[in-house]
Amino acid sequence: MCSSDLKDGVNTKNSGKIEAGGNISGRFFENTEVIAKGDLQCNYILNCRVLTYGRIFVEGPIGSIIGGDVTGVMGISTTSCGHESNVKTLLRVGSTKEIRKEYAELIMELKEVDGQIETFEMANKKFEMIKQNMPEKYDSKMALRVTQSKIVKMAQKAKLEEKSKALYNLIRDSERAVVKVKNHIYPGSRIYMDDKTYMPSSVFSHIIVKKTPSTIILRDYDE
């Protein structure tokens, strides 16, 4: 599906998955895997595995992320994170290993397609030379097939370039991703930003967690 607006909540009891090519919104998500190429918006997330290529907004009467492993590539904004019981709650922002791997694979595929296009171009030149110098040996059907194959590869290249550009922009822009916690973040929570980790030793309130080139820092929520 492209986008999904779930009026009620979702609880698959760890046996189901919600996936969308765009945004997902719902009242709550419990014990569910959620994947969205866009944003996710809900009232609370409980014991879920979440991956969004956009942002995650958890706000409302409860407004909490409790338990689970939650990734918002472009950032996470929540009222609260974790619980007084110090339940393990993992938040991740920034590009994932899978996204970087996908980008690297696209670049390799582009190089391969470029090589194939170059081969077809060389073949076209040879056919043109044969047509001019030895017309009796010119194979028009084969020349047409080569030209058509090149056109197909050019179309494939255009799609790969579009996809690789989108991923490149996502990886670049996700460097500025932050975690915003309006009320409380509890011990037991962990925030991962690339190779850096923040683990609150006590309850912190009203903070923004952001990455610098050397470390992770906390800022006031209203900054």
Model-identified regions with their sequence ranges:
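Extended repeat-based interaction scaffolds and adjacent low-complexity, acidic/S/T/P-biased segments
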Residues: 10-11
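Intrinsically disordered, low-complexity terminal regions
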Residues: 15, 19-26, 33-43, 47-223
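Short, small-residue-biased leader/transition segments that mark boundaries at the very start
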Residues: 1-3
